[in-house]
């Protein structure tokens, strides 16, 4: 059978349909991971296997209605995303289709099949300012910043020469207003001229090149005391939040998006509930951050990739790659980006389903054998880097992946594969959540491997903090050991020192680690407040121990200390109610 060409594109024919997986013959010359258009409605698909002239395609849209013999169009390019002004503050689906634009055009609640809308608005006018250090005749190489566009009040969008390009500037647009279709740069390389607009495309599976990877040494401040004080991450780190249903993974992810010290947020809802994305869309525009002397909505530094659980399964993989590629683009501008993937378990389930339809050999719990490799290739795109091109700049991507192990079982293949890759583990505990202790991060099983990297930062700014942190961990661990004895013989039979340990551990648990996300004073805790709260609690612990040991024949007891220092203890416990907006002198 001969291969047909339609509009210069090669045309294959469907020979088998199995859910989101389609087999097509006559696909000679097609490439792995090439983007194809399937059926008469031109559904978006991607080639994931080639055998002779037969290609196996995963389709990113609902495949009902496809029939044997329908055409398959090869586009000749891989699945790519559009990168340019207009990304921030927008909401896309897993294959970067703008949901608001689709809603306007279709007047439908759901995305119509085969809809083809450009990711970025071609008609919108942007204010372009050329770089001061470049002029016609200057050489320009990959990654060089040749213009700036004020994308939002929070982000100046730097227009960079795409990777793999270089030459001499023939034309550089003067300051003014341009659309994404207008030429703003023309270069000449060996007699060949190329024109560039403010937008370019990049394949999602290919990491964007960098000059070098750097050691991360600045903390990612989340505003959550338990994370910042006990298990900190760095800007450019990898974190996992595994937890059973109802433990608060999404709330922690959203809190990081709202309050962390990142320049930009990419929030990928990968196979999660639709109402959670609706909550994000409702909450984020109302939340503000102070920039100079004005308040700005945090939506202006946030990009949402919504891929809810009722959307096609295959698109979950695309949504993860779309999110990380856009994050890399903003990182290349010299920004610190946080990417939330909620949840990677849903992506793994999609891999399992497609792997099953391809009749691949299943590994643990039916997941494919390459699950760990796929997770690693995703998490390894995080990190702090020295960006390509001039001027010299550094950027970072922090990946926070939520994991939903069935029944909260951390030996689940997705969780164990993730823990082998990430450096920070914020383990959520169902029992803490049932006790209404939020964030329900279990302080006995969680860990951070970035403490060594962050020591110079703490030594310079909060010299005593590391001692307080170590002491707090010891108190919480000792409390866990003592609880077994207490359950057997009761509190009264313990030594006074142990009673003090239990009292201070309770104080740390209830008044320091627990945090109310729904109050003005406690939804965000600046790091200095965390340090001062911890300092006061540890000082009380040390002074109480000295009073008990040094009381001689009088035998000063915890009960007497509580009686004499009741007001002080009450003040220490009530520090969380103090609003940080009133200044640090309160503490």
UniProtKB/Swiss-Prot annotation:
Pfam families tied to this protein: ATP-synt_ab (PF00006), ATP-synt_ab_N (PF02874), ATP-synt_ab_Xtn (PF16886), ATP-synt_VA_C (PF22919)
Subunit annotation: V-ATPase is a heteromultimeric enzyme composed of a peripheral catalytic V1 complex (main components: subunits A, B, C, D, E, and F) attached to an integral membrane V0 proton pore complex (main component: the proteolipid protein).
Alphabetized InterPro entries for the sequence: ATP-synt_VA_C, ATP-synth_a_Xtn, ATP_synth_asu-like_sf, ATPase_a/bsu_AS, ATPase_F1/V1/A1_a/bsu_N, ATPase_F1/V1/A1_a/bsu_N_sf, ATPase_F1/V1/A1_a/bsu_nucl-bd, ATPase_F1/V1_b/a_C
Family: Belongs to the ATPase alpha/beta chains family.
Positions annotated to bind ATP: 243-250
Cellular component per GO, a single term: proton-transporting V-type ATPase, V1 domain
Annotated function: Catalytic subunit of the peripheral V1 complex of vacuolar ATPase. V-ATPase vacuolar ATPase is responsible for acidifying a variety of intracellular compartments in eukaryotic cells.
Descriptive protein name: V-type proton ATPase catalytic subunit A
Organism, as annotated: Cyanidium caldarium
Glycoprotein recorded as keyword: no
Catalysed reactions, semicolon-separated: ATP + H2O + 4 H(+)(in) = ADP + phosphate + 5 H(+)(out)
Classification via PANTHER family: H(+)-TRANSPORTING TWO-SECTOR ATPASE, V-TYPE PROTON ATPASE CATALYTIC SUBUNIT A
First-level EC class: translocase
